[in-house]
Amino acid sequence: LDVELDYFYKLTDNMLFSRAVAPSLGYGSLPVNDAKMENQGVEFTFKAHLVDTRNVKLDLRLNGAHYKNKMIEMPVDYYNADGTAVRQQMNGAMAVGHSMYDHYTYVYGGVDENTGDALYQAYYDSRYGGLGDDKGNNEYNYITSLHQWILDQEEAGVENPERFLCDTMFADMGYATLQYVNKSYLPDLNGGVGIDLDVYGLTLSVACSYQIGGYGYDYTYLSLM
């Protein structure tokens, strides 16, 4: 039995991003090298010599890898007049402490029993009123991006802003809240398995791949709904 086990760590910096610039320059953005991201994981390979005779050899191969990805520094959004850099808080689904492969999407809440419409989770700030009250609650109270809202509150000095969050279900996706859903495109484990058979000099090899875990998004199915 042959066994190989490897651990890897890679820090990537100077990634390619677009930075917004003044429209007076004649273009809206400028490609820049910025931000930092780390990748780390383990890889393994097993090879078992099941049959090893003069004329017949049979080997079984198995390999796999588990890895994760995380942003540790976001790109600069703009520079203040004194030259200090202000970094982006989010860029799409990317944010510090999260993987660029994390799903940042809406949460499906089932079907409305009365209308048959699909329901989606919507968060709102309880400090500005709830549903049907007299505190001026309206569509502007609903949070479109949950993680961005939390970052904005923390930047404003609000401690534990999550305590002000309330949620409800809406059939109108326009009120739904984008949020991390603890799912990633990255598989928990992926690799391959195969056999090598050698009989009197005639070799037959078979290889297959596998993946365990990882979540995709079916945009074709979405377009049909």
Predicted regions and their residues:
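Outer membrane beta-barrel strand-and-loop segments of large Gram-negative receptors
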Residues: 8-50, 150-158, 178-181
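Segments forming glycine/polar-rich beta-alpha architectures that bind adenosine-containing cofactors
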Residues: 168-170, 185-186, 201-203, 208
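Membrane-embedded beta-strands that build the outer-membrane beta-barrel scaffold
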Residues: 1-9, 42-50, 56-66, 191-197, ...
